């Protein structure tokens, strides 16, 4: 018994055990599974899929959507057209408009109260329409592939087109009939004017209208009868065509069944002639080839890993060397300072010695016995002087080397600035292109507005002509009320059209604003992408070392800035003390009551200013919290928007595919396309409006923040050093956190690399051992002639019933501990990232610039 490595499928993972090397399964279970698979006869559907080369999922048995022809039988008419029994006009409902309007208003109110539900409702409708169109297209394609075209298919399609045309005519006639009925009802409902006794009323106009209506009713009924007759003939022709299609389909299925049976016979004859020994040899050869390939790949991988390790070590050595050089430079600077101090001290001592020696010489001239001592002292002094000069020369040489290094770093900084200027030029070019696009869109929108205005003028002219006609009729006819009502209705329609034109103009303005916001977003996203690209490019060793050098330079600059700030602080303190002393002197000189009152007023003003400062700081903190919340909401909305836009893009792509795969376009397809485009534009407008609202809120909050910061800067002009110190501390914390983050990433990558190397080595060793065992077990079986399948196994059946080793408590405990550690690591990572983002924003606001 030996274990073999494999990558199981999803439904076979229960039979395997997971290890760091791979999934393990026993040999006998694998062989039994192979035998079970060989024993099972192949199904007809599987053989068809294997012959055709299609690896799609099999459809369900009960699903006949792909093979059904019910799409060609669908009509908006019933099997038998109902007779149009004209009841009395009083029995028919006279005005259905208010009921329909109330139902529509209810649905609109329910949807308008909840915009998310409205959006979901629209998406569900789009999905349903998309699914129905896809099913229709698939069934049409399958039907067209299965049926041979002898001219009858075109006839059937033409008949379907005629049917649709007759349907539209039928609907139009019904609508006209309903309108005439409504007009007839309105005429009946009108109360007759009070008759005068002296002058009899003329009803000739009403009688003429009634006669015209009756003639129009008769014409519509005759047209309806004709339409019904044509529809019945067309349906009969459709039934005949369907019968022909069904016969052809039956013949095609019979031929397919015959071909499948022949294929099954051929495959069974081929499978019976194959030998088991050839299969075993082929398997062994495959394993050998795989082993050789794996050894080759593992060798190349190890070489690459060694190279990567060498490069990483080189990077680490360079980093350590850089740090050592920095420390060495700092030590040299300290030594320079100490050497200068020692030189000055030695100069002082030298002068003292010279003075002492001159005194001693004067005394020694008197006493010749002390000449030897003086000579020795002079020699010692000369030697000390020479040593000091050598020290000075070495220190000057080191200073020159440091100056050269500083110049090289300055040249690198100049190259970086040139690259930055190039990137800025590219960004400006992109902005120009966006401006041109925006101008083109604005011109198109202006053209649309002009067309709408022309339409409005035409409608106004038609309205005037209608008014003139109605006035003429109202003077001659007694039905003046009806004409006035029609005039008011037309005026309302004109007002509604004007409102729609205003709405369209407002939407144009909104689109222009949204285009500007989209430009700004594009710039931001481009800058973010460029920053990411720069970060990705900076992962190379040379650029990484350059960045680390820049970091060290920045640290030195920060230290120098801190020193200068401390000096400035000391100067300001000295000035403050001097001013304080002068002020106290003035107070001692002029002990008047006015000065004391002014002092008290100033103190009160200081207290009030301090209170205002505290209030402003609290408000600033609250505003920052609100800003963070708004940004989180904005990010959530952006994610929702991305999902919706991805869904819309998917729907539009599939719609284009369906349009391309569908037959020649017709009136119905054009109407569907227009509906889809309207829905898509409505959805897009709603989403853009929401985005615009969020962006406006964000801009308002940031403006408020900027105003607050400006007020604080005006109020706190007396204490600039505190803000500078805090900004410096924030920068130091930001760079420290970024550095620790990069170190953690490098450590994680190193651990993963080491683990993968170990796993690859162990897996290659296991594979080699398994292949050696296979060779040892198979070689005696091939040579021996007394090999029999029957073998008395000494193991119990319960031994083979086990599917794997039971889990130990230690493994579960280690797994739980690793999960806890992973959770803690993710929490730390999240906190650090939040801190980095907060510091970045704080630094940006401190420098009076916006980076969002």
UniProtKB/Swiss-Prot annotation:
Organism, scientific name: Eremothecium gossypii (strain ATCC 10895 / CBS 109.51 / FGSC 9923 / NRRL Y-1056) (Yeast)
A matching Pfam family: Nuf2_DHR10-like
InterPro entries assigned: Nuf2_DHR10-like (IPR041112), Spc110_C (IPR040593)
Record function comment: Component of the spindle pole body (SPB) required for the proper execution of spindle pole body (SPB) duplication. Potential role in cross-linking filaments or anchoring other molecules. It is essential for growth.
Coiled-coil spans in chain: 158-711
GO CC, alphabetical: chromatin; condensed chromosome; condensin complex; cytoplasm; nucleus; spindle pole body
Subunit-structure text: Homodimer.
GO molecular function: chromatin binding
Entry protein name: Spindle pole body component 110
Sequence similarity: Belongs to the SPC110 family.
Chief location of this protein within or outside the cell: nucleus
Membrane-spanning residues: none
GO BP, one annotated term: mitotic chromosome condensation
Location in or out of the cell: Nucleus; Cytoplasm, Cytoskeleton, Microtubule organizing center, Spindle pole body
Record key words, sorted: Coiled coil, Cytoplasm, Cytoskeleton, Nucleus
């Amino acid at each position: 018994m030996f274990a073999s490595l494999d990558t199981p499928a999803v439904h076979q993972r229960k039979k395997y055990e997971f290890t760091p090397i791979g999934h393990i399964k026993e040999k006998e279970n694998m062989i039994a599974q192979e035998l079970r698979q060989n024993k099972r006869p192949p199904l007809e559907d599987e053989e068809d899929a294997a012959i055709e080369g299609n690896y799609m999922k099999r459809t369900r048995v009960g699903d006949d959507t792909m093979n059904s022809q019910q799409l060609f039988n669908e009509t908006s008419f019933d099997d038998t057209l109902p007779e149009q029994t004209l009841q009395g006009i009083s029995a028919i409902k006279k005005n259905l408009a208010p009921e329909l309007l109330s139902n529509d208003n209810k649905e609109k109110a329910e949807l308008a109260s909840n915009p998310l539900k409205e959006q979901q409702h629209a998406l569900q409708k789009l999905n349903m329409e998309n699914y129905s169109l896809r099913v229709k297209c698939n069934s049409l394609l399958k039907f067209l592939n299965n049926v041979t075209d002898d001219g009858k298919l075109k006839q059937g399609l033409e008949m379907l087109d005629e049917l649709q045309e007759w349907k539209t005519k039928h609907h139009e006639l019904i609508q006209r009939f309903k309108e005439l009925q409504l007009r007839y009802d309105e005429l009946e409902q009108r109360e007759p004017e009070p008759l005068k006794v002296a002058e009899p009323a003329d009803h000739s106009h009403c009688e003429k209208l009634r006669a015209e209506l009756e003639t129009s009713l008769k014409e519509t009924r005759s047209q309806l009868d004709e339409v019904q007759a044509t529809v019945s003939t067309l349906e009969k022709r459709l039934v005949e065509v369907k019968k022909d299609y069904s016969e052809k389909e039956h013949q095609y299925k019979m031929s397919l069944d015959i071909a499948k049976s022949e294929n099954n016979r051929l495959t069974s004859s081929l499978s019976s002639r194959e030998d088991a020994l050839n299969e075993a040899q082929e398997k062994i050869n495959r394993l050998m080839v795989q082993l050789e390939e794996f050894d080759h790949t593992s060798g190349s991988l190890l070489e690459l890993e060694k190279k990567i390790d060498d490069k990483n070590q080189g990077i680490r050595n360079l980093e350590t060397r850089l740090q050592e050089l920095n420390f060495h430079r700092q030590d040299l600077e300290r030594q320079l300072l100490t050497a200068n101090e020692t030189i000055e001290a030695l100069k002082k001592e030298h002068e003292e010695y010279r003075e002492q020696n001159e005194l001693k010489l004067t005394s020694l001239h008197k006493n010749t016995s002390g000449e030897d001592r003086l000579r020795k002292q002079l020699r010692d002094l000369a030697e000390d002087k020479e040593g000091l000069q050598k020290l000075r020369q070495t220190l000057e040489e080191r200073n020159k080397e440091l100056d050269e290094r500083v110049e090289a770093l300055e040249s690198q900084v100049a190259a970086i600035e040139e690259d930055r200027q190039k990137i800025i030029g590219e960004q400006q070019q992109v902005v120009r292109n966006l401006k041109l696009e925006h101008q083109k869109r604005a011109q198109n929108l202006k053209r649309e507005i002009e067309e709408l205005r022309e339409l409005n003028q035409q409608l106004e002219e038609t309205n005037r002509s209608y008014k003139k006609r109605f006035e003429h009729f109202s003077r001659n006819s007694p039905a003046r009320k009806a004409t006035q009502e029609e005039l008011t209705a037309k005026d309302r329609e004109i007002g509604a059209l004007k409102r729609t034109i205003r709405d369209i103009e407002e939407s144009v303005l909104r689109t222009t604003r949204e285009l500007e916001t989209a430009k700004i977003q594009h710039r931001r996203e481009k800058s973010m992408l460029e920053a990411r690209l720069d970060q990705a490019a900076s992962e190379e060793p040379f650029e990484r070392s350059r960045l680390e050098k820049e970091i060290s330079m920045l640290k030195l600059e920060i230290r120098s800035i801190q020193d200068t700030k401390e000096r400035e602080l000391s100067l300001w303190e000295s000035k403050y003390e001097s001013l304080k002393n002068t002020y106290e002197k003035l107070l001692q000189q002029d002990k008047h009551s006015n000065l004391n009152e002014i002092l008290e007023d100033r103190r009160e003003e200081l207290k009030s200013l301090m209170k205002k400062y505290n209030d402003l700081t609290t408000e600033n903190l609250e505003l920052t919290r609100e800003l963070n919340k708004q940004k989180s909401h904005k990010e959530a909305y952006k994610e929702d928007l991305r999902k919706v836009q991805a869904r819309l893009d998917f729907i539009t792509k599939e719609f284009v595919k369906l349009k391309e795969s569908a037959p020649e376009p017709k009136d119905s397809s054009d109407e569907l396309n227009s509906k889809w485009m309207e829905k898509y534009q409505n959805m897009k407008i709603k989403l853009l409006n929401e985005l615009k609202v969020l962006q406006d809120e964000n801009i308002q909050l940031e403006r408020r923040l900027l105003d607050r910061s400006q007020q604080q800067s005006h109020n706190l002009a007396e204490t600039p050093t505190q803000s500078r110190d805090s900004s410096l501390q924030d920068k130091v914390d930001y760079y420290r956190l970024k550095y620790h983050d990069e170190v953690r990433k490098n450590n994680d990558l190193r651990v993963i690399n080491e683990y993968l190397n170990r796993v690859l080595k162990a897996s290659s060793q296991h594979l080699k051992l398994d292949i050696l065992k296979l060779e040892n077990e198979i070689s005696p079986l091939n040579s021996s002639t007394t090999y029999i399948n029957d073998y008395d196994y000494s193991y119990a059946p319960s031994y083979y019933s086990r599917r794997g080793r039971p889990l130990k408590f230690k493994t579960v405990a280690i797994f739980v501990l690793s999960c806890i550690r992973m959770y803690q690591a993710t929490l730390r990572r999240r906190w650090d990232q939040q801190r980095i983002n907060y510091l970045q924003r704080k630094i940006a606001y401190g420098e009076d610039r916006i980076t969002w």
